[in-house]
């Protein structure tokens, strides 16, 4: 129920979030419309960067009868796989801790928790309330799906290790789905986790034998390889170069898309991704890495620690670094947070004094957690001092609307309530203190964060949807559609038309003029001025004020937010573009090799 509230409630009430989710949604909808479930395509071009599982799951929803009636913005279908994946992780964490309760570690020795259900719910909420999970668990990209498939796979593999009576093969089968979600990185992360854990336990050969790794990898390959093989047969070298060469090897070995980050990038990400429970995560990680081999059924803490380390080490080594790369570590973080909190309560269940069974490290972690919660609450109460500092040219009215909404003060109220619960538990022995702190944060998400999401959608995305509606009304049968300056793939999704995207540079105008005459893609044919004398252009205000765009004297048909809809005479466009080329100010660069385009 909590998972449904956190991830599914109001899922389709805000539109697609630019820039990446509309590309996923557009490719999935194209599969449903064309019946081609092999090759993802968006905006008239193949999309090779991700495997098909996310597109298949979205596409199944898009293919439902009357889909447009119950999901007019398309965001319910796009976000549902991520939401269900996140709920699946919550259920898997709960099921694992309920079936295999982990002993608490404390000065009084080890003992099993009296209420394992509490630890199970705390772990699920520690995962779900991660700022990264709250964001990526509701949007239409493949990161949450990878995280969910990998988490279920690893938990099933650990269960097979913990209980010899459990089947060994389900984990490998789900790992194949993880490979279909985002590629071979899933096998690498699973392998690093198992090797590190097996070495730490001093039982790597036994682990490998119990899990039947060789046969397991064959099962993984049987699930994943057929699609890759079919793509190589049908699409050939372009797919190999793009998916394996650029989106996997090159992303690991060199920086792409300007995502250059220092080697320590994921250390602050680790801290932020578990707020406000990061101190408990660090304590749980420390105890999970303690050099004490344990019985298989009691080794989940160590397994989670090596799971988290596998993600940290692998993506730290990668040249390209993004915050979303940390998402596969968040289920492990949820386990470590819950078990650290369980340790702190182990001595209290029999009425012992405050801190018994927990030790000073737990008291420090508990106090630091409450301090972080209080800090966030204070920062939200004084939001009037920092909200005016938000300057985003794409959302010029955000500051005023955020201040007037009252949603930030509502968020401050829930964080204050969580801080008060935490402070109370510092002074009195309260079983389940972390669950008591988590529940106000669930309310924060439901009653403050979701309304803030809706507000942001209205400021940032609604103007694009309004432009799309204007395009549908104004476009002529012969006209092409272009967007220049600020580029939003959701324009393609909401118009259902091929959009020629060009940036703010001088080359953008030259490219647009040349592409109208020469570029051919599915849904877009080249044309002469006689065949199509005008072109519809969606242009943002700042770009429209540049001298070379003012020279085309576009006829303004509509405006919404920062965007303008122009009808541009192609004769003027070609004349202005030719003048730029003759002056050496621009050139047609759209034919240059580019690893990513849409």
Task: Place the predicted regions along the sequence by residue.
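Membrane-integral, polyisoprenol-dependent glycosyltransferases
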Residues: 1-348, 381-384, 560-562
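Membrane-embedded architecture of ER/inner-membrane glycosylation machinery
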Residues: 169, 287-598
């Amino acid at each position: 129920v909590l998972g449904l509230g956190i991830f599914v409630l109001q899922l389709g009430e805000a539109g697609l979030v630019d820039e990446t989710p509309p590309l996923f949604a557009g490719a999935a909808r194209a599969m449903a419309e064309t019946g081609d479930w092999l090759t993802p395509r968006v905006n008239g071009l193949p999309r090779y960067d991700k495997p098909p599982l996310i597109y298949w799951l979205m596409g199944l929803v898009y293919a439902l009868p009357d889909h447009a009636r119950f999901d007019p913005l398309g965001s319910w279908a796009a976000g549902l796989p991520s939401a269900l994946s996140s709920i699946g992780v919550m259920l898997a964490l709960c099921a694992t801790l309920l079936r295999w309760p982990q002993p608490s570690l404390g000065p009084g020795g080890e003992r099993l928790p009296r209420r394992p259900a509490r630890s199970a719910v705390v772990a699920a909420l520690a995962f779900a309330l991660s700022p990264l999970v709250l964001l990526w668990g509701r949007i239409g990209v493949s990161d949450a799906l990878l995280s969910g498939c990998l988490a279920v796979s690893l938990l099933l593999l650990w269960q097979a290790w913990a209980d010899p009576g459990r089947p060994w093969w389900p984990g490998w089968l789900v790992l194949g789905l993880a490979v279909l979600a985002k590629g071979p990185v899933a096998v690498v992360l699973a392998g690093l986790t198992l090797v590190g854990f097996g070495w730490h336990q001093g039982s790597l050969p036994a682990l490998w034998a119990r899990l039947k790794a060789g046969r397991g990898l064959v099962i993984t390959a049987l699930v994943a390889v057929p699609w890759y093989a079919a793509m190589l047969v049908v699409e050939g070298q372009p797919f190999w170069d793009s998916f394996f060469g650029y989106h996997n090897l090159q992303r690991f070995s060199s920086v792409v898309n300007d995502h250059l980050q220092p080697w320590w990038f994921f250390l602050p990400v680790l801290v932020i991704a578990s707020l406000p429970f990061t101190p408990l995560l660090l304590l749980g990680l420390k105890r999970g890495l303690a050099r004490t081999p344990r019985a298989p059924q009691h080794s989940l803490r160590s397994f989670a620690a090596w799971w988290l380390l596998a993600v940290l080490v692998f993506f730290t080594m990668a040249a390209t670094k993004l915050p979303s790369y940390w998402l596969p570590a968040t289920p492990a973080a949820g386990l470590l947070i819950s078990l650290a909190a369980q340790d702190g309560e182990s001595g209290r269940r029999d009425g012992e004094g405050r801190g018994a069974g927990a030790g000073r490290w737990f008291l420090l972690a508990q106090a630091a957690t409450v301090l972080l919660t209080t800090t966030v609450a204070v920062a939200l109460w004084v939001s009037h001092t920092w909200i005016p500092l938000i300057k985003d040219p794409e959302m010029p009215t955000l500051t005023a609307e955020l201040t007037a909404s009252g949603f930030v003060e509502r968020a401050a109220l829930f964080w204050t309530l969580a801080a008060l619960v935490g402070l109370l538990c510092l002074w009195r022995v309260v079983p389940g203190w972390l669950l008591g702190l988590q529940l106000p944060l669930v309310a924060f998400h439901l009653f403050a964060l979701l309304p803030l999401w809706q507000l942001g959608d209205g400021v940032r995305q609604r103007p694009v949807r309004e432009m799309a509606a204007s395009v549908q009304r104004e476009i002529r049968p012969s006209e092409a559609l272009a967007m220049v300056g600020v580029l939003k793939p959701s324009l393609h999704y909401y118009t259902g038309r091929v959009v020629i995207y060009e940036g703010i540079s001088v080359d953008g105008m030259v490219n647009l003029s040349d592409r109208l005459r020469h570029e051919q893609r599915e849904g877009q044919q080249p044309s002469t001025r006689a065949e199509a004398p005008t072109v519809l252009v969606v242009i943002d205000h700042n770009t429209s004020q540049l001298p070379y765009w003012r020279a085309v004297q576009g006829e303004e048909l509509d405006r919404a937010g920062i965007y303008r809809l122009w009808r541009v005479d192609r004769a003027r466009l070609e004349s202005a573009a030719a003048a730029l080329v003759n002056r050496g100010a621009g050139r047609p660069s759209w034919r240059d090799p580019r690893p990513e385009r849409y």
